[in-house]
Regions:
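Generic detector of well-ordered alpha-helical segments enriched in charged/polar residues
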Residues: 2-6, 60-61, 220-223
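Conserved catalytic-core segment of nucleotide-activated headgroup transferases in glycan assembly
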Residues: 30-44, 172-226
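Active-site and donor-binding regions of nucleotide-sugar-utilizing enzymes
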Residues: 18-177
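Non-catalytic membrane-proximal stalk/linker segments that position and tether the catalytic domains
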Residues: 1-19
């Protein structure tokens, strides 16, 4: 029944409409999709833009009244149907559960309805050497937004990208960096997470493995450094 309903409803939603969805993971964090959405909402180009938002996320002060009307709850029926009807999905996370709310394995029954172009917005400027994660052949994306010449050269040279896959528009979030704050002589030490110290919750999130973390060489080396 659900499959039949979706196959009937999705084409009706898509008819004579251009729909773009913006997603910042299934949990909703203020990342590049949020800033891209705020930037793009100012355009009057006939495109319907919607930001996918988790109902449990604290979004106080994020949106004005007009933007709030363009929010879609993650996992809702509307999200499921609009995901199938979208022309573009712009996401700062490229995991399937981060922008599509279909359970693992279920999406294949609806994939024939989709024609969306998946635009990866990244989180920032890629500087680490991670081709096993971010090479074009490892990611199910159509285009990637870049902000610097370094990224263009790096992705083409080390990540199997061709120039045609890169959108050189730069991240709108860079315009939100406060310019009135004076530089401070401080050093931020922020070790990145380690995949082997967490496990997936099956919904796009992660569950920490506390015992493994405490006993890991990663933890011991960080503490020794501090």
């Amino acid at each position: 029944y659900r499959s039949a309903l979706t196959k009937l409803a999705a084409p009706r939603i898509k008819k004579n409409r251009c729909i773009w969805l913006y997603c910042d993971s299934s949990k909703t964090v203020k990342d590049n999709a949020y800033y891209q959405f705020i930037h793009d909402c100012k355009k009057n180009d006939g495109i319907e833009r919607y930001y996918i938002c988790n109902k449990d996320a604290d979004i106080t002060g994020w949106f004005d009244d007009s933007q709030r009307a363009q929010l879609i709850e993650y996992g809702s029926v509307k999200h499921r149907l609009y995901a199938l009807s979208a022309d573009k999905i712009l996401t700062s996370f490229y995991g399937l559960q981060d922008f599509l709310c279909y359970p693992n394995g279920a999406y294949k029954y609806f994939a024939d309805l989709t024609t969306f172009e998946l635009i990866y917005l990244q989180h920032g400027v890629l500087h680490a050497h991670l081709p096993t994660m971010y090479s074009l052949d490892r990611m199910a994306i159509d285009k990637e937004v870049v902000s610097t010449r370094f990224e263009v050269d790096n992705l083409i040279t080390n990540y199997c990208f061709e120039d045609s896959f890169l959108i050189k528009s730069r991240m709108p979030r860079l315009k939100h960096i406060p310019k009135d704050k004076k530089p401070e002589k401080k050093i931020l030490f922020a070790p990145s997470w380690r995949k082997f110290l967490v496990e997936s919750d099956g919904k796009g999130g992660w569950i920490p493995k506390n015992a493994a973390f405490i006993n890991s060489e990663f933890y011991k080396n960080v503490m020794a450094f501090l």
